[in-house]
C-alpha cells in the first residue's frame, strides 16, 4: 500500500485477476479473488499465504477462513499449474478495489459474467482488438457496484484506478521456467495507490 484510501481507519483492499486462455475454443476464462486484506495502512506490505503441502484438509479449511491464501489464477482451475507456451496465448487483467460495505465475491461474479459475454460475442477477434474490449468491459462491470450511491449507513467499494493488463514477455516465461519471475502493476486513483506483485513460477 503506497497511499491508503480511508481517511478514518485502515483499508481493506482486494484484487481481482481475470485469466483468459486464447488457445481453446471457445476461449476459456476464470476470475480469481484475492482478499480482502484487513487493517492495511500506507507503507505496509501484505501478501498471500502459501499453504504448505500435505496439510490435513481441516487445517487448510481453517487457514482459508483467516488468511488470504495463495491461489494460482493460471491454470484456470485455481489448483493446477499450467505451462504457457507463448505470451500471446493468454490474457491477464487485474483490478484493485477497497472494500467498504460491498461484497467482493459479487464483484468477482459481475466481472466473470461480463467477460464471458465479451468472449462469446468476440470469438473471431484478434488479440490486439480483444484485449482493449475486455479491459473496457471489466471496468464497466466494476463500475456497477463501485458507483452505487453512498447511503451514509452503506458505502460502495472504491476502485483504485482502472483495470490493467499484466503483460508477459518471452523472457518472463523463461525466467519462470528456470525458477521464479516477478511482475508489478501500479494502481493509482483518487481513492488510493497500490503496487501489486505477481509471482510467475512452475508451481506457486
Walk through the language-model features, giving the residues of each.
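N-terminal amphipathic/basic membrane-interacting segments and domains
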Residues: 1-204
